[in-house]
Amino acid sequence: MTYTLPGSPVLLRHFTLDDCTVLEANPATMDSDRFSFFGLPVPGRMRRRVESGEAHPKPGEVHGLLVVEAEGVCIGFVSWHPQNYGPINAPTANFGIGLIPSARGKGYGTEAQKVLVDYLFQTTTVNRVEASTDVENIAEQRSLEKAGLLREGVVRGAHYREGRYNDMALYALTRPDYEQARAASSATKITTGFSASR
């Protein structure tokens, strides 16, 4: 399974054992990515998920994990999980991204998040996709805005990292926003969002 958008330099696809090797060789550390570091990874955990098939989402699932590929190689991953608001089972898809250090700062993260937003709206029934990031992570906030998500506010003290609770900037896009952006785009170039206005 692969998923991309016309003109995008990245694609999303299922994990392979080779991808596990790449990611195991490039773990998040306090020095390389303090916003994604939550301690040492469990050795072999991703390999076990790939071998069991657990790492391969099916269309329609509101949880999953896919590789981000650019120029034919694994450069990171995207993941998503359901987030319910209230007692009705009508979840939002909350997503995140992790890129290896050599892939950062090249626009791949923004492109991967655009592709993922499109994938989630095209393959699930969610009415909303969202992502949050540390209020100090300015690069990811810009990336989410470029991917078409709108900043909705700050969720105070929601994220435990580096021995303390941190504030998170919350971004989201609803299905009506997404469909309006698609309708406004040309027939030959499909985009997943629009620049957030301030």
Predicted segment positions?
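Positions that flank functional sites
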Residues: 42, 136, 159
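Conserved acetyl-CoA-binding loop-helix of GNAT-fold acetyltransferases
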Residues: 105-119, 138-146
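GNAT-family acyltransferases
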Residues: 1-102, 165-198
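A beta-strand edge to alpha-helix "cap/lid" segment located at domain peripheries
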Residues: 122, 127-128
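Conserved hydrophobic/aromatic "anchor" residues
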Residues: 15, 119-121, 149
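Active-site acidic-Proline motif in GNAT/NAT acetyltransferases
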Residues: 97-102, 106, 122, 135-136
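Conserved catalytic-core motifs of GNAT/GCN5-like acyltransferases
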Residues: 82, 130-132, 150-167
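Amphipathic alpha-helical recognition patches that constitute DNA-binding helices
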Residues: 11, 22, 41, 94, ...
